Swiss-Prot record:
Cofactor binding, per record: Binds 1 [2Fe-2S] cluster per subunit. This cluster acts as a Lewis acid cofactor.
NCBIfam families: ilvD, PRK12448.1
Any one Pfam family match given in the protein's UniProt record, by short name: ILVD_EDD_N
Gene that specifies this protein: ilvD
Record bears the keyword Lyase: yes
Gene Ontology MF, one: magnesium ion binding
Domain of life: Bacteria
Residues holding [2Fe-2S] cluster: 122, 195
Family, per entry: Belongs to the IlvD/Edd family.
Biological classification of the source: Bacteria, Pseudomonadati, Pseudomonadota, Gammaproteobacteria, Pasteurellales
Organism of derivation: Actinobacillus succinogenes (strain ATCC 55618 / DSM 22257 / CCUG 43843 / 130Z)
Keywords in alphabetical order: 2Fe-2S, Amino-acid biosynthesis, Branched-chain amino acid biosynthesis, Iron, Iron-sulfur, Lyase, Magnesium, Metal-binding
InterPro entries: Dihydro-acid_dehy_C, DihydroxyA_deHydtase, DiOHA_6PGluconate_deHydtase_CS, ILV_EDD_C, ILV_EDD_N, IlvD/EDD_N
Enzyme Commission identifier(s): 4.2.1.9
Protein name, entry field: Dihydroxy-acid dehydratase
Pathway given in the UniProt record: Amino-acid biosynthesis; L-isoleucine biosynthesis; L-isoleucine from 2-oxobutanoate: step 3/4; Amino-acid biosynthesis; L-valine biosynthesis; L-valine from pyruvate: step 3/4
């Protein structure tokens, strides 16, 4: 029978000092012996996805106490990738994931907490907390802040939906007037919540449902909707129940590593492929799997990408649908339900509800359960009112979207594309693989051959695109931006957005050992592994080299004889200490970033720490 971890500091005469300190936090005599549950919040006023979380921790805490636990809240950092984008701040985004994981581990182990409720939302916070949950392997539930409502405005007397990416693209388009840019800017992000499309934040929150670690609706219920409050309350109640099952009934099946099995990771990746999620999710799932001790690799993602179709096309892959539309169509359980009917889901994996995925789908899939209460839950919709307050409206759609032939979510017979929304490409320029979000690529350029134009930094690439150096037919190569080479593996949202602004969105490709925002679309290929700084062949590309991209055959190659590549590699190695480093790049790199870069592995390993260096 497992003993409460917190007993280390709450039981025995020798812990009188620790108990005295616990009492000073508000604990009473009858609290000692109850499970101490860490409420891991991530409130900050810097990030719209987290600005409304200030009171969420205490909301959960009070429910934990009602259910018989002791709640203690602490906060993690949270970086807004959109605000950090396009300048040196982006170097800190990915490293913050590992810092969050470490900080949660530090706090929970230092204070011997028995369980966690993780309140996350945006890009690196959810994966960082997931990594910590796998390390700690104590009862854990995830509940996120929820998606932002889609922006809406009238331009040229036409009502259009907007999001952050529209503001970025239109602001760089000389054909768009200052007045229209102003309207777009002020309409793109109308409420609190994670940016309204299937960008990285919402993708990761959706994947927690498929992993089995969050409640149904977590990924899709709007941040502003009153119904989301119940997810927080239920998380507080459920974590106490799970604690009792583990610590009192010797039930290890409720622990994160028991739920997030290899099959659960396959379910999560299949969902990601089916919904055309952010390519960053690949990086994060690989990292979380390593922390969980699960042997889930790029080869598994490649295998799944060849059999799972794309069943939903959501912003940034289309302007028609945003997260509010996904929820109306049945949310993540709606997509998983269609994958299940197609025979593409492991049905017997367990979830945090104590159900198998099959049992959970029977309750929460709107196609197989026509219960009015469930119907009402998924009719929760946007209000269209600017606000930073959670649970501030209770608007509902008149009907759910259960049209699986033409709606937001499709069945297998009416798939958006038979090819999935993400693909892994291999070749002599990326021997360990690279990632492309095929859901965001026009099918006319799934096969593309072009001349390389090489940049040693994102900043130089932006200048080259806006300055007219990049022409139709180019493959823009941005290297030394990987986890080690950046260091920090910046997102390349501005280069991809500016290619569209310059009318080159369907006329060029972009290849990088960096990564992309979840808001990226177009022929944008990232995570090239090994990265240039680790001796990857992307570091050997010269201007005007021919690069062939073949998505259907999952191939990407530098059209050069092996002998020429060997000559170039030998010449690079001859540079000694200057080998595999960018030329003429001026970049201030702090000690903290140098430490991250020193230990970072390439993207195919999730950019986690290289433990052989410890």
């Amino acid at each position: 029978m497992p003993v409460l971890r917190s007993a280390t500091s709450t039981q025995g005469r020798n812990m009188a000092g620790a108990r005295a300190l616990w009492r000073a936090t508000g604990m009473k005599e009858n609290d000692f012996g109850k499970p101490i549950i860490a409420v891991v919040n991530s409130f900050t006023q810097f990030v719209p996805g987290h600005v409304h979380l200030k009171d969420m921790g205490q909301l959960v805490a009070r429910e934990i106490e009602k259910a018989g636990g002791v709640a203690k809240e602490f906060n993690t950092i949270a970086v807004d990738d959109g605000i950090a984008m396009g300048h040196g701040g982006m170097l800190y985004s990915l490293p913050s994931r590992d810092l969050i994981a470490d900080s949660v581990e530090y706090m929970v182990n230092a204070h011997c907490a028995d369980a966690m409720v993780c309140i996350s939302n945006c890009d690196k916070i959810t994966p960082g907390m997931l990594m910590a949950a796998m390390r700690l392997n104590i009862p854990t539930i995830f509940v996120s802040g929820g998606p932002m409502e889609a922006g809406k405005t009238k331009l040229s007397d036409k009502l259009i939906k907007l999001d952050l990416i529209d503001a970025m693209i239109q602001s760089a388009d000389a054909n768009v007037s200052d007045a229209d840019v102003d309207v777009i800017e002020k309409s793109a992000c109308p409420t609190c919540g994670a940016c309204s499309g299937m960008f990285t934040a919402n993708s990761m929150n959706c994947l927690t449902e498929a992993l089995g670690l969050s409640l149904p609706g977590n990924g899709s219920m709007l941040a502003t909707h009153a119904d989301r409050k119940e997810l927080f309350l239920e998380a507080g109640r459920k974590i106490v129940e799970i604690c009792k099952r583990h610590y009192e009934q010797d039930d290890y099946s409720v622990l994160p590593r028991s739920i997030a099995t290899f099959e659960a990771f396959e379910n999560a990746m299949s969902l990601d492929i089916a919904m055309g999620g952010s390519s960053n999710t690949v990086l994060h799932l690989l990292a979380v799997a390593q922390e969980a001790g699960v042997d889930f690799k790029m080869a598994d993602i490649d295998r799944l990408s060849r059999v799972v179709p794309c069943l939903s096309k959501i912003a940034p892959n289309t302007n028609k649908y945003h997260m509010e539309d996904v929820h109306r169509a049945g949310g993540i359980m709606g997509i998983v339900g269609e994958l299940d009917r197609a025979g593409l889901i492991h049905r017997k994996v367990k979830t945090i509800l104590g159900l198998t995925m099959e049992e959970q789908l029977n309750q929460y899939d709107i196609i197989r359960n026509k219960d009015e209460k469930l119907n009402k839950f998924f009719r929760a919709g946007p209000a269209g009112i600017r606000t930073t307050e959670a649970f501030s409206q209770d608007c509902r759609w008149d009907t759910v979207d259960d049209d699986r032939a033409n709606g937001c979510i499709r069945d297998r017979a009416h798939a958006v594309t038979e090819e999935g929304g993400l693909a892994v490409l291999f070749g002599n320029i990326a021997e360990d693989g690279c990632i492309v979000k095929t859901a965001g690529v026009d099918e006319s350029i799934w096969k593309f051959t072009g001349k390389a134009i090489v940049f040693e930094s994102q900043e130089d690439a932006v200048a080259g695109i806006l300055g007219g150096k990049v022409k139709e037919g180019h493959v823009v190569v941005i290297r030394y931006e990987g986890p080690k080479g950046g260091p920090g593996m910046q997102e390349m949202l501005y280069p991809t957005s500016y290619l569209k602004s310059m009318g080159l969105g369907k006329k060029c490709a972009l290849l990088t050992d960096g990564r992309f925002s979840g808001g990226t679309s177009g022929l944008s290929i990232g995570h090239a592994s090994p990265e240039a700084a680790s001796g990857g062949a992307i570091g050997l590309v010269n201007n005007d080299d021919i690069i062939e991209i073949d998505i259907p055959n999952r191939a990407i190659n530098l059209v050069l004889p092996d002998e020429e590549l060997a000559v170039r590699r030998a010449a690079m190695e001859a540079k000694g200490a200057r080998a595999w480093q960018p030329e003429n790049r001026r970049r201030e790199v702090s000690t903290a970033l140098k430490i991250f870069g020193h230990f970072a592995t390439s993207a195919d390993k999730g950019a986690v720490r290289d433990k052989t260096k410890l």
